[in-house]
């Protein structure tokens, strides 16, 4: 705020009987102009994002939705919209308090976390993208919990496990890695911490490695359950 505001200058002037300045007598202090603020938001992309998100929320009968578009090269936010939305220039007449859901709401990220588990596998040196993983008969038991895919994918590569979103393959990979391998990749990606945009109301979600000694907890984290993130955190993690 101080950078944008600037500072007023001062000078002594001579005025005529009508109050008009007729001469500058002394310049006490030159004014300091405030700095410019350039937004990363692209108004065209913001409009398209708003239109498409509203259509998707209505089309799926959802109660709410958020969309954030990030430049993968710079990390700049190009578009950020929520539904339901509101016009800040008009009266607000909504039953539910209006908030910026991209930074205030958190949820289980689900299968969007599987690529991070694959990254942990690649970093371990035990896996390559073409490493084969057996998923037959389409399910397996981890202690008392059954993990299953919608269909039996048989033997697939690590890359195919991401493409086909296989719970079984990803869970088996997680159990084959060191206990905190997946957690460490997620933590390095920024989960569990503030993104630092300065947007008011930002929360960090719930993210901890407590309970990672449990095989069930390790597999759940590998495919995006047992912890929560904000849409902003998830988008930033992919950059």
Model-derived segments and spans:
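Beta-lactam-recognizing serine transpeptidase/beta-lactamase-like catalytic domain environment
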Residues: 15-28, 41, 71-111, 116-239
């Amino acid at each position: 705020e101080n950078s944008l505001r600037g500072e007023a200058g001062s000078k002594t002037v001579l005025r005529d009987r009508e109050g008009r300045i007729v001469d500058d007598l002394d310049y006490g202090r030159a004014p300091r102009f405030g700095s410019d603020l350039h937004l990363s938001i692209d108004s065209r992309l913001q409009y398209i994002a708003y239109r498409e998100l509203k259509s998707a929320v209505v089309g799926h009968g959802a109660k709410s939705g958020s969309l954030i578009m990030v430049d993968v090269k710079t990390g700049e936010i190009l578009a950020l919209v929520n539904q339901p939305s509101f016009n800040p220039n008009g009266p607000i007449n909504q039953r539910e308090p209006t908030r910026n859901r991209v930074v205030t709401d958190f949820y289980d990220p689900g299968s969007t976390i599987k690529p991070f588990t694959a990254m942990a596998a690649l970093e371990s040196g035990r896996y390559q993208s073409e490493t084969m993983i057996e998923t037959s008969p389409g399910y397996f038991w981890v202690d008392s919990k059954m993990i299953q895919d919608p269909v039996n994918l048989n033997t697939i590569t690590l890359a195919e496990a991401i493409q086909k979103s296989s719970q079984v393959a990803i869970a088996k990979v997680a159990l084959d890695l060191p206990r905190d391998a997946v957690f460490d990749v997620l933590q390095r990606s920024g989960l569990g911490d503030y993104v630092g945009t300065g947007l008011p109301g930002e929360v960090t979600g719930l993210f901890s490695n407590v309970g990672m000694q449990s095989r069930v907890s390790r597999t759940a984290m590998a495919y995006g359950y047992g912890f929560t993130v904000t849409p902003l955190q998830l988008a930033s993690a992919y950059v």
